[in-house]
Amino acid sequence: MAKTRVQDYVEKFSDQPIRFTPYALKKTGLVQSQVFLKIEDYMLICAPFQLSMKRGIFLVVLSAQEITFFQQFQKKLCSINLTFQKTGTKKPLNLFLRGTIERIGPVKGKQNVCMMDASLKGCPNDLVEILGDYITAFEGLKSQYGNFSGKAIPVDDAAAKLMRFNNYVELILGTTKARATLTALAVNSLSLRLSGTPPGLAEGEPCSAKLYFQVYQFTASGRVSALQRGEGDQVLVTMAIEFTPELIEIVDDFFFRQSIQGKAKSAAGK
């Protein structure tokens, strides 16, 4: 008998957590403001941190005294309410989970933030599909990252329009932000042009770039891999960037749209 998609996901991904970055929140449709953890008579508003089919880690704003108070509920039963709103669907999906609080403690370096670790007593099929679909798609992005690495796209007006780029990017060096022009991009690198040299700009230095597209606004982190003087006071910066799922989607979509355009032109020329 053929396995169902749910059975396949449970076998492959039951212990694999996803971390709720802005990208994961958008793709899964989890409504961040509608995550609640109930312990006995206490209902806590949580920020999701990690979730698998067996375990969830949630962040709660609590004082030191409140954290000490709630630690008495370790190994006690709890319930979790999650709400998902997928793109294109009008009705939200509300899920109710039961579990056990395994650990409660302060988050190091974060004042008044508590981490609550809960083991789940079961995972609804809807949640299995949401997590499984996301993990499967994310693994596909990792494969595309390898395929597209080094394939730089010169960002002229036509390319910017095709990739739906809003022509706005900021280079971030520590606390310094500098407006830049994006001249080329790949899944593993960005080429930027700046007017002037902002403080801290040097080869090998960690940096990030915030990019604005119609589909996503996101930050790509990495290091300055090369610097070159341009005309006047202009500086040309090459960034080696880390795996950034939003950018991989944009590059993949660009090459797809480009191929469609090419086929349309070929057909028109016949």
Model-predicted segments: where are they?
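Structured alpha-helical
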Residues: 1-270
